[in-house]
């Protein structure tokens, strides 16, 4: 491992980035250096702009993919090399067609069907935790038995995205299921341990296993929508909004740094839109039946 790569790795770990993000960032910088055949610290703004254009026009990568590469290069130059000027030299690309899609949201009935279709008690507890807390996939896989506080009725997320921790209210229905699951599985460290290792109790469930629980339950429940761990997170947030929870509270529960990120759930909430009072309703108009009779009377003359 080169000294530069080691420095970047240490900086990413110090800031508590997820293993998946660390791998992606290191790979992005490696590919950038390989493209020019030089050490990345020898490259400058001209190469950065040229590389971004290459990714968009020649490689024809989606804007979202290029944004991820830009984030990695920004981190390398600004955080690792401490070259602050690169913050302005490397802007994120704009999508002229705004291809951002709103996330998939399940109805309450679909969530119930999904949970009831779980293959075993562990998967049921996992699905209920994902939906009942709005945790990210990584957060739920790293959840420890000690993070569940039945006395305070809270679940502590210590390893949130970006390093922040937060408390999430523990639903009585979820607590009941987790207790039943614990008596069956008796997990020691991680609440959802890996089942692929002899010492599985000391290792968290893999990302693949979390995904599998969601997709298999969706298949058995005959839900046509694409269901992922994040689908349950989006659904939970949307249902909270529809139930009257304010955006600021949802922001805290989800662990969002920016309220604008949380605000997209306004676009997903049909009840929120339906609750908007139309000024037409406040007009003192004649009844439609009375008006209809008047119209017919005029046409009959």
Where on the chain are the PLM-derived regions?
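Conserved catalytic core of the tyrosine transesterase superfamily
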Residues: 1-301
């Amino acid at each position: 491992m080169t000294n530069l790569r080691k420095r970047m790795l240490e900086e990413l770990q110090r800031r508590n980035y997820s293993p998946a993000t660390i791998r992606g960032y290191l790979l992005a910088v490696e590919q950038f250096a390989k493209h020019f055949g030089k050490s990345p610290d020898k490259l400058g703004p001209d190469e950065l702009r040229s590389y971004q254009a290459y990714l968009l026009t020649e490689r024809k990568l989606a804007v979202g993919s290029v944004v991820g590469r830009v984030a990695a290069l920004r981190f390398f130059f600004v955080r690792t090399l401490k070259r602050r000027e690169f913050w302005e030299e490397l802007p994120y690309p704009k999508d002229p067609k705004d291809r951002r899609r709103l996330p998939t949201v399940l109805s309450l009935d679909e969530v119930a069907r999904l949970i009831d279709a779980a293959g075993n008690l562990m998967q049921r507890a996992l699905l209920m935790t994902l939906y009942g807390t709005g945790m990210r996939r990584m957060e739920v896989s790293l959840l420890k038995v000690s993070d569940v506080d039945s006395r305070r009725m809270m679940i502590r997320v210590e390893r949130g995205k970006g390093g922040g921790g937060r408390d999430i209210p523990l639903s009585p229905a979820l607590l009941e299921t987790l207790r039943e699951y614990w008596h069956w599985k008796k997990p020691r460290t991680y609440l959802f341990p890996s089942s692929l290792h002899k010492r599985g109790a000391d290792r968290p469930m893999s990302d693949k296993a979390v995904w599998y629980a969601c997709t298999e339950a969706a298949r058995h429940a005959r839900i046509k929508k694409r269901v992922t761990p994040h689908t349950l997170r989006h659904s939970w947030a949307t249902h909270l909004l529809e139930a009257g929870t304010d955006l600021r509270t949802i922001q805290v529960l989800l662990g969002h740094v920016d309220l604008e990120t949380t605000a997209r759930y306004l676009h997903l909430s049909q009840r929120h839109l339906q609750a908007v009072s139309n000024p037409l309703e406040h007009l003192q108009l004649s009844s439609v039946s009375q008006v209809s009779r008047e119209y017919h009377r005029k046409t009959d003359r």
